[in-house]
Amino acid sequence: MTAGRHWSYDSLKQIAIDGCTENVEQLKLIFVEEIGSRRRSDCIRTIEDLIDCLERADELSEYNVEPLRRISGNMPQLIEALSAYTKPENILGHPVNLYQELRLAEELRQQLRIAPASQNAQPSVSELAAAVPPTAIQNYATPAAFTDHKRTMVFKKISEELGRYWRRLGRSAGIGEGQMDTIEERYPHDLKSQILRLLQLIEEDDCHDPKHFLLRLCRALGDCGRNDLRKRVEQIMSH
């Protein structure tokens, strides 16, 4: 039963993914305008792919779950969960535009100085944050400076909410399958450590131009269908 339970946006998506029995080709016809192109449509083979596509197009988000309502006809649990879902408060006070946020990420990239983290046998949020020496971070007047505290908050938020599909983020960020296999072998039963190590690899990969790390991370989160987390990161950085 779903009555009285608070449902997160991620939970709604998972219910849709697990419970959908409708033909994906039929669903693609329903969302043909939102998908926008034949090329994108050809890349959609599962309900999960469709959700990713809608999120990338900013047609589906934690603030707009209407597309999930349109596919919930044969899923009673999803219907109930949607009726109990409360969208988060929009702290910006106005609708969020994907392209405006990408420009914000570009502006943040110009302001940040990020040093690569050292490798740790057992990565943790605190260890990864401590890997950047204070002297490596300039004291910007802007609140968007990437301080140790904000870095810890970003890593903590992603490690807690990214979930078991973390390899998608790795692929979107250009991390090789072999590197991700190594992460799984090193931390076979520790999802949080897997994600933290992935973030560390993404950061290390940008050591030639550390300013690119945050922009690359935000873009990768968007590309892998986690616009909700990308927004969280940008909110952390904008305060």
From Swiss-Prot:
Gene3D superfamilies attached to this UniProt entry: Death Domain, Fas
KW Cytoplasm (keyword) present: yes
Entry keywords, A to Z: Apoptosis, Cytoplasm
An example Gene Ontology CC term for this record: cytosol
InterPro entries, A to Z: DEATH-like_dom_sf, Death_dom
GO molecular function: CARD domain binding; caspase binding; death receptor binding
Subcellular location(s) per record: Cytoplasm
Effect of K87P: In strain: G125, G130 and G140
Domain of life: Eukaryota
GO biological process: apoptotic process; defense response to Gram-negative bacterium; extrinsic apoptotic signaling pathway; immune response; peptidoglycan recognition protein signaling pathway; positive regulation of antibacterial peptide biosynthetic process; positive regulation of defense response to virus by host; positive regulation of innate immune response
Annotated stretches, region: Death-inducing: 1-105
Death domain segment(s): 151-237
Role according to the record: Component of the IMD signaling pathway and is required for the host defense against Gram-negative bacteria. Interacts with Dredd, promotes cleavage of Dredd and is necessary and sufficient for enhancing Dredd-induced apoptosis.
Subunit (UniProt): Interacts (via N-terminus) with Dredd; likely to bind Dredd simultaneously with Diap2 to form a trimeric complex. Interacts with imd.
Name the record gives this protein: Fas-associated death domain protein
The gene coding this protein: Fadd
